[in-house]
Amino acid sequence: RILVDTHALKSDLVEVLEEWLPEQVDPTTVVYISFTGRGVVESATGAVSMMPFDSTATSGGRLYSLRRLQESLARLRIQQAVVMLDLSLGLTPGKEALDGIAPLWGQEGIGKEKIMWMVGNRAVQEAHYYDQGRHGLFTYQLLKGLGGAADLDKNGTILAGELCTYTKGQVLKAAHEQYGNEQEPLCLPGPGQGALVRLQPVARFK
């Protein structure tokens, strides 16, 4: 399912993720979710929410939190899920931010072991748009990686961990060289954390 603009309201996200999707999966299913747009970080806690088309940074009731997304995925009888987030992030306005507050990406709790998070921008800042690629910089590098560039060991299969590692490196390099500032993606779970979800094949070429 593809949700865009006026068809990407909070009610649409709820309907697709919490009502439609559970009817489509079984224990062998791998779910892929990509969200591109804006997000908001709670100033006091660092909790991250996605902003559907009908929301603003102050309309808390129309935001869709990463915690809610994780919980909806954890309830599914699936093998694994890969979540790709290309978000420009801002703090909730009108509230005093704690010193050094950072987005809370590490989602604790049930289902953590079967969800791979590929986050395009780990800090509170605008994510870069790549004009030449007509996508956000992170999304462009993800697509390039899926096209074969992320096959780091040249075995014809791209794993989720390979894809995120490749994309992170390319975004870091391009942001520094072309824009003069940082945009650092994040992969959760990270390398060496023993998570099987990092070994999930996301593309094959033979």
Question: Residues of each region from the PLM?
Answer:
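Cysteine endopeptidase catalytic domains of the caspase/legumain-like
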Residues: 1-206
